Amino acid sequence: MKLYKYQGTGNDFIMIDNRLQIFPKQNTALIQKLCDRRFGIGADGLILLENDQSTDFKMVYYNSDGNQSTMCGNGGRCLVAFAKKLNIIKNKTTFIAIDGLHHATINENDIISLQMKNVEEVNIHDNYVFLNTGSPHHVQFADNLSNFDVKNEGAKIRYSDLYGQAGSNINFVHQTSPTQFSIRTYERGVEDETLSCGTGATATAIAMKATGKTNSNNITINVQGGKLEVSFNQENSIFTNIFLKGPAEFVFETTI
């Protein structure tokens, strides 16, 4: 079985062409082992590219804990790059994921712009914002972000009574300019900080606009692994035409 490794701003994934249904999807232990950074290949998640009757392909995403999970923005961008490598698409595509249809384009510099699901509800609280951008996200400001204990503080909120057993991804934010924010994200399913989170970057951009921290509809999000751009339209409290833009790079391929 051939495996491909991709990364998008440091968020890394194992890709498998599963159009012939060769991968044992119910083998949680295998997914865990492949994603293990000491005993396997190492990745934040594993993604299967499968056939779909009405779109170019289907995305099936698993966290590194071996469980199928909700939408992954960086993973979606990497899967678009993978589909191009497999000659399934050229420079634009429509595919289906767990949260519905996604459109994407690839520019001349191999930067991928991925349309995310509309956000119709943003829950604003005193010291945090909660919203779903294909995956659930808690967004709050943090002082001294570079030295912040993301793993421990993120786990406290993720496992708190606030979100119950299902949990949430947790984003800690620092504003660096009127249109730029730095974030660090604790991802459920990985149960650790990741170098980047696409749905988290998207959630942060929308949360900052919804709370009046920025007036822009084009926001730069600096993550540990690089830079992402988020753009959207807003009408009252509804956000549409949301696009997550950034690099997605092939790392290597191997056979097991």
From Swiss-Prot:
Transmembrane segments: none annotated. It holds the Pfam family DAP_epimerase. Its EC number is 5.1.1.7. It comes from the Bacteria. It catalyses: (2S,6S)-2,6-diaminopimelate = meso-2,6-diaminopimelate. GO terms for cellular component: cytosol. Keywords: Amino-acid biosynthesis, Cytoplasm, Isomerase, Lysine biosynthesis. Its main location: cytoplasm. One of its GO terms (biological process) is lysine biosynthetic process via diaminopimelate. Substrate binds at residues 11, 63, 73-74, 169, 187-188, 198-199. It is found in: Cytoplasm. The active site is at 72 (proton donor), 197 (proton acceptor). The record marks 137, 187 as: Could be important to modulate the pK values of the two catalytic cysteine residues. The keyword Phosphoprotein does not apply. Pathway: Amino-acid biosynthesis; L-lysine biosynthesis via DAP pathway; DL-2,6-diaminopimelate from LL-2,6-diaminopimelate: step 1/1. GO terms for molecular function: diaminopimelate epimerase activity. PROSITE patterns: DAP_EPIMERASE (PS01326). Belongs to the diaminopimelate epimerase family. Homodimer. Catalyzes the stereoinversion of LL-2,6-diaminopimelate (L,L-DAP) to meso-diaminopimelate (meso-DAP), a precursor of L-lysine and an essential component of the bacterial peptidoglycan. This is Diaminopimelate epimerase. It comes from Flavobacterium psychrophilum (strain ATCC 49511 / DSM 21280 / CIP 103535 / JIP02/86).
